[in-house]
Amino acid sequence: MSTTVEVFIDYVCPFCFLVEGTIDELKRECDVNLVIRPFELRLKPIPTLRPEDDYLPRIWKDSVYPMSHQVGIPISLPSVSPQPRTQKAFMVLQLAQEHDLGEEYSHAIFKAFFREDQNIGDDAVIIDAAVSVGLTAHEVQQALLSEARRIQHAADQSYAAQVVGITSVPSFRVNDYLVVGVPSATRLKKAVNILSSRNPAQEKRND
């Protein structure tokens, strides 16, 4: 039986892009059902980050670029300022997942932002990314206008924050346990193998 692994991401988080190789290796070597879950790091009215301020260049120099070189995934600090909100991109993720294209769509969004320096808060950019993986422009436009999808996204955000307890991304949830940050493939596979065999209710009773 497949083990469900939920991965919580935000499309403006570079570490969520850099963990793709780890996820690919996990899928190759373990029987897992990967579910991408949204978690916006900065909800309205919290301002999003600006690349011209001190924080982003510093964290990229100290952490992002070294990790990029380590995992072999090219990546650049986007110049979009302020950084886009990701609500609309996540609304279209719902559509992509309905077509079993969630991972492909997410990769396209990451690529647009971190390699092509595009504004992934812009409808046209989201549509282009979605169409590139097989969705139609019409259905993506409908998804962007859908109040039902907007409500679902709010529910997804609440699930991540209130039910699971997510505070940072990427985070992985396996059998009610969280692995936070960017684990190595070895560590994540070990966690899946151990946690998938446990009974969460029994573990909680033993805590």
Range-by-range predicted roles:
Residues 1-23:
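Local sequence-structure signature of Cys/Sec-based thiol-disulfide redox active-site neighborhoods
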Residues 15-28, 55, 108-207:
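C-terminal cap of thioredoxin/glutaredoxin-like
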Residues 17-114, 203:
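Structural alpha/beta surface segment adjacent to cysteine/selenocysteine redox centers
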